[in-house]
Amino acid sequence: MTAVPEFTVIIPTHNHARLLPYAIHSVLTQTVGSFELIVIGDGVGDDTRDAVADLSRNNKQITFVDRPKSPRTGEPYRHEELLRRETPYVTYVSDDDLLFPDHLEHTREMLATHDLVHGFGLHVDAAGSLVLELVDLGQEWFRRRELKKTSHASLTAMGHTMPAYRRLPYGWRTTPPGKFTDHYMFQQFLSDPACHVSTLRRPTALKFPFILRQTWTDDEREQEMALWARRLSDVKERAMLLNEIMTLLHRQAILLEIWRGKRVWWLWNLLAALRRWMQR
């Protein structure tokens, strides 16, 4: 009898045949080895089929699901696959993003006490610089914003328990026009007051937003992915990367304190002016 893995990792894909192998490799090199990887094709071409076949030929952890193009990004296909599985944990990565080697390790630790986790916000801009997205869905203020129109949700590094998924009224479903697919799914989880949510406390994934790279050629995108994949796979490079992130966090904290100071000073002046007006 085959043992049930701890994780189901899902990579939805459509037309990133040259980038997909890097995303897959970032899953295969995880420090937690108990996982299955489901690559869900949403109207893919032969180049994507060939790319997955090359990687899955000698690796039984990879399953390729080849489906016709859906109205959006193949959300119902994800639902079908999850209903077939009994793994305790689920996580995702976009086909043009990368996971740190310890993503499953830290996600498992967080999901031991939470139903849903959101990845530590980190992406690379078009100039090659790291950008932090400071969000904590464990805080009620952020949760309320996410339930409205603001979207900080990201598929990459999203994780949830299978029991929490089965409690949802719908699960993955076709997203209405004008809405982000990831945000639409997060809202379903967050609409349940009993859903225990948090954000990972350290970076475990690196995103490369397509919206910042719409004019890039396939060669340019692959060169970028190859560069960062090498950095993430090297222990020393990864340590340097974490130092860069700590520097960014320190800078953000200083800016926040400056902003708070200015806000307090502005409020103090306003109160002083009101007191003077009332004493007239």
Roles of regions detected by a PLM:
Residues 230, 234-280:
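Boundary detector for helix-to-coil junctions that initiate low-complexity/charged tails
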Residues 1-249:
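Nucleotide-sugar donor-binding/catalytic module of glycosyltransferases
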